């Protein structure tokens, strides 16, 4: 059995926590995040740490406590340091530009694609073939990166498309006559 929930989440300097029943709000330098935790989890704040435990009489309470601890830890890291995803475009004529609060993409379609960014997410294009997405909510940063990648996933023959910077695309060999 995993022991994730037994370790407390240590709060760095400059991070505030508000507990209101099962709702937890974490405020830091990069922003503020709120989440409602499962009823099977007991949450308490002790000094500069948050402690998680199972509620008595609930079957999967330890599993839920471990999940809650991981989610809250990601919230603390997000409001303190933030999260970043980097995408690269590979292909002839594939380009990315910033258009206000949207990312403009030229991906070989008959029309340009514009992806609007949700609140709290920033993107920048240091070059025409790179997109860097940053924000304090890990889930939203990952979802925006996945949405942009889904417009043109890397194809298996030449590897053209939008990919994560650390992604390895396995290429196939072309069919022989």
From Swiss-Prot:
One of its GO terms (biological process) is cytoplasmic translation. Part of the 50S ribosomal subunit. Coiled coil: none annotated. InterPro entries: Ribosomal_uL6-like, Ribosomal_uL6-like_a/b-dom_sf, Ribosomal_uL6_a/b-dom, Ribosomal_uL6_bac-type, Ribosomal_uL6_CS. SUPFAM superfamilies: Ribosomal protein L6. Keywords: Ribonucleoprotein, Ribosomal protein, RNA-binding, rRNA-binding. One of its GO terms (cellular component) is cytosolic large ribosomal subunit. Belongs to the universal ribosomal protein uL6 family. This protein binds to the 23S rRNA, and is important in its secondary structure. It is located near the subunit interface in the base of the L7/L12 stalk, and near the tRNA binding site of the peptidyltransferase center. This is Large ribosomal subunit protein uL6. The keyword Ribonucleoprotein applies. Pfam families: Ribosomal_L6. It comes from the Bacteria. GO terms for molecular function: rRNA binding; structural constituent of ribosome.
């Amino acid at each position: 059995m995993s022991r994730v929930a037994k370790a407390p989440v240590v709060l760095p300097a400059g991070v505030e926590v508000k507990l209101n029943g099962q709702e937890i709000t974490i405020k830091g330098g990069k922003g503020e995040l709120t989440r409602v935790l499962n009823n099977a989890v007991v949450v308490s704040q002790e000094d500069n740490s948050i402690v998680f435990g199972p509620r008595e009489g609930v079957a999967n309470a330890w599993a839920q406590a471990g999940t809650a601890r991981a989610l809250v830890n990601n919230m603390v890291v997000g409001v303190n340091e933030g999260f970043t995803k980097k995408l690269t475009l590979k292909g002839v004529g594939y380009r990315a530009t910033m258009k206000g609060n949207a990312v403009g993409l030229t991906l070989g379609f008959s029309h340009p694609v514009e992806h609007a960014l949700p609140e709290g997410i920033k993107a920048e294009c240091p070059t025409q073939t790179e997109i860097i997405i940053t924000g304090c909510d890990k889930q939203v940063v990952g979802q925006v990166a996945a949405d942009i990648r889904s417009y043109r996933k890397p194809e298996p023959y030449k590897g053209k498309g939008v990919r994560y910077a650390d992604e390895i695309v396995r290429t196939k060999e072309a069919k022989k006559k």
